[in-house]
Amino acid sequence: MNIDYVKSILPHRYPFLLVDGVIEESEDRIVAFKNISISDPVFQGHFPEYPIYPGVLIVEGLAQTAGILLLKSVEGIPLFLGIDEARFKKEVRPGDRLIYEVRKLGEKLGTVQVEGVAKVDDKIVAKARLLLGVKKK
């Protein structure tokens, strides 16, 4: 599923829409991707001589992927409420295809906890547990 599908679900837009498409999804799991390009605005400052995609944007991409999963069953605006156990293992560089794998762990009091893993070439580059909610429209 392409960018049009993503834009039909998420409220985010360029330059802060960090998911390019969805590879697969089920009720409690989703796999999405972002193609990292040297033309991404972040590389004007992070770092021009040795561009590295920022870890915080990888985590935001995981959160947006989780938002797609949430908004399939609830209407509203996805809110990123918290992060635990974030780890960054490898650099992500222009030309990489970042794969986001997000799995729902549980729901409690209007919040959803997910586990996210980001990969490049089937190697883990980052992982985190995220807490999300949905603001009703």
UniProtKB/Swiss-Prot annotation:
Catalytic activity, EC: 4.2.1.59
Keyword Lyase included in the entry's annotation: yes
Catalytic activities: a (3R)-hydroxyacyl-[ACP] = a (2E)-enoyl-[ACP] + H2O
Top-rank taxon, per record: Bacteria
GO cellular component term, pick one: membrane
Function: Involved in unsaturated fatty acids biosynthesis. Catalyzes the dehydration of short chain beta-hydroxyacyl-ACPs and long chain saturated and unsaturated beta-hydroxyacyl-ACPs.
UniProt-recorded name of the protein: 3-hydroxyacyl-[acyl-carrier-protein] dehydratase FabZ
Species: Thermotoga maritima (strain ATCC 43589 / DSM 3109 / JCM 10099 / NBRC 100826 / MSB8)
Gene name for this UniProt entry: fabZ
